[in-house]
C-alpha cells in the first residue's frame, strides 16, 4: 500500500512539526529591571551605590536615593571580571528621559574595581525622578533610580 501526500499535506505537516518544536522553547534573555546590575561582554557591573559623599576607597559614605536640589550626587560603580581595558559610561537622565549628564571613564583590567561618577548643579537640580544608567563597553549594564526633593 502506497500513501500519496499532496503538496498541501506536506506543507501542513511541516508547519505542525515546526510549531510543535517551538512551543517548548524559552528565550534566554531576561529583560533588565530598574535598580539591577548585569553582565555584558568584557565584565560585569555588580553594584551601583549613590549618595552625597565618597570614602577614600570610592565607596559611598551613607547611601541614599533622595537628594536636595543643591546636592552633589555621587555614584560608586562596582565592576567584576574585567579582563581588558573597559569603558564605563554614566548617563544621568531626568524623568522625561532628558539627558542631564553623560561621562565616560576607561578602567584598567583588574578583575574587580570601584569607579566614581558624580553630578552637581550649583543653582539646583529640578525636583523629580532621575535615573542613572551605566554602560559597560557600550552596552547597557545597570540602572539606578533616585529622586531630587
Predicted regions and their residues:
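Sec-dependent bacterial lipoprotein signal peptides
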Residues: 1-21
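Short edge beta-strand/loop segments characteristic of extracellular beta-sandwich folds
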Residues: 73-80
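Short proline/glycine- and polar residue-rich coil/turn motifs
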Residues: 106-113
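Surface-exposed loop/edge segments in extracytoplasmic proteins
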Residues: 97-104, 140-141
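Bacterial signal peptide processing site
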Residues: 23-26
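Short, compositionally biased P/S/T/A/G/V-rich stretches that sit at domain boundaries
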Residues: 31-71
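Conserved aromatic beta-strand anchor motif in extracellular beta-sandwich/beta-rich domains
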Residues: 90-94, 134
Amino acid at each position: 500500500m502506497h500513501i500519496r501526500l499532496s503538496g498541501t499535506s506536506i506543507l501542513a505537516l511541516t508547519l505542525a512539526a515546526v510549531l510543535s518544536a517551538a512551543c517548548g522553547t524559552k528565550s534566554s534573555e531576561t529583560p533588565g529591571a530598574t535598580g539591577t546590575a548585569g553582565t555584558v561582554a568584557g565584565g560585569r557591573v555588580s553594584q551601583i551605590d549613590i549618595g552625597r559623599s565618597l570614602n577614600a576607597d570610592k565607596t559611598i559614605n551613607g547611601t541614599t536615593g533622595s537628594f536636595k536640589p543643591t546636592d552633589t550626587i555621587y555614584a560608586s560603580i562596582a565592576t567584576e571580571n574585567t579582563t581588558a581595558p573597559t569603558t564605563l559610561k554614566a548617563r544621568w537622565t531626568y524623568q522625561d528621559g532628558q539627558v542631564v549628564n553623560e561621562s565616560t571613564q576607561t578602567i584598567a583590567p583588574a578583575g574587580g574595581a570601584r569607579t566614581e561618577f558624580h553630578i552637581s548643579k550649583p543653582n539646583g537640580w529640578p525636583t523629580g525622578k532621575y535615573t542613572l544608567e551605566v554602560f559597560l563597553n557600550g552596552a547597557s549594564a545597570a540602572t539606578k533610580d533616585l529622586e531630587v526633593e
